[in-house]
């Protein structure tokens, strides 16, 4: 029997963890596990500064002039109330991915995950007529704690919005869904954040690593964790409407689900996001202005 002291055991555990973290930085998981899948984000040229902000997008991305654009203001009293025959059903969000990265794509912080084809989380039921597989998660924030969400509820903003992107099952990539131009090709579930005095310990898995991606174009691996740690699943009491991406190419192929019950975040945690830089300096605001609802209906699934 091997005798080992507590201090030696702790050193051993720390060494194993360090080796694991180093491996996540250098390994190409798609080569190590050919069946692993990661959602690659198409690259489009845009920004939020005067020279490349939303008022300039229409010059390069004609879809941004469409009549079903996002984000919108949700007038809660005008929402059509629906009693669904079945709840939203979430599968796999309580499991950890093979690997996880955060990226400064020069406009947002993007959380990407890699899964085996059999373990990728998906959502179905409720307002959905298709199955949607997880893709990417995108954070939006603002100059202050009074703004930062792209969507508004009765013209009230939250300090941050997390958009969880999904692809309709059958498409091989986000780019395939964009190219197909099916009006239900993408599902984005938005979660909103509310300032609290205490840090949200679950968000710390991301926040404590933001200093590593301050420079534009940087990407780092972080220890993987279940997505359920940063946003809760839900079955009912959500808003939904048909719209577009809130960033180029602004394709009108998105089913939006908005969860109005906010997630806790502290002022100091939000402040770490404002240190992220683009080529124009710190990203202090990365939200598109709300768009006209026009003839669309917004539904509330009770």
Model-derived features: positions:
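Alpha-carbonic anhydrase
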Residues: 2-302
């Amino acid at each position: 029997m091997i005798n080992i002291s507590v201090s030696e055991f702790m050193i051993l555990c720390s060494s194993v963890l360090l080796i694991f973290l180093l491996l996540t930085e250098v390994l190409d998981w798609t080569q190590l596990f050919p069946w692993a899948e990661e959602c690659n984000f198409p690259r489009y040229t845009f920004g939020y500064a005067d020279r490349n902000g939303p008022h300039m997008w229409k010059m390069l991305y004609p879809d941004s002039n469409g009549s079903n654009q996002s984000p919108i203001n949700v007038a809660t009293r005008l929402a059509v109330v629906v009693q669904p025959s079945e709840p939203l059903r979430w599968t796999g969000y309580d499991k950890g991915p093979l690997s996880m990265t955060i990226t400064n794509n020069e406009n947002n912080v993007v959380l990407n995950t890699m899964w085996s084809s059999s373990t990728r989380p998906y959502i179905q039921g409720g307002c959905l007529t298709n199955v949607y597989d997880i893709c990417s998660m995108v954070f939006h924030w603002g100059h202050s704690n009074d703004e930062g969400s792209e969507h508004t509820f009765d013209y009230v903003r939250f300090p941050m919005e997390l958009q969880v992107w999904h692809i309709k099952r059958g498409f091989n990539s986000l780019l395939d869904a964009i190219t197909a131009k099916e009006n239900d090709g993408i599902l984005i579930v938005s979660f909103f954040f509310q300032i609290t005095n205490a840090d949200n310990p679950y968000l710390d898995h991301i926040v404590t690593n933001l200093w590593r991606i301050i420079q534009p174009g940087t990407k780092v691996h972080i220890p993987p964790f279940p997505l359920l740690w940063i946003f809760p699943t839900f079955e009912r009491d959500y808003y939904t409407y048909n719209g577009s991406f809130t960033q180029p190419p602004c394709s009108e192929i998105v089913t939006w689900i908005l969860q109005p019950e906010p997630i806790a975040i502290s002022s100091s945690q939000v402040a770490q996001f404002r240190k992220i830089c683009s080529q124009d300096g710190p990203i202090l605001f990365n939200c598109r202005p709300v768009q006209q609802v026009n003839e669309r209906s917004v539904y509330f699934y009770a």
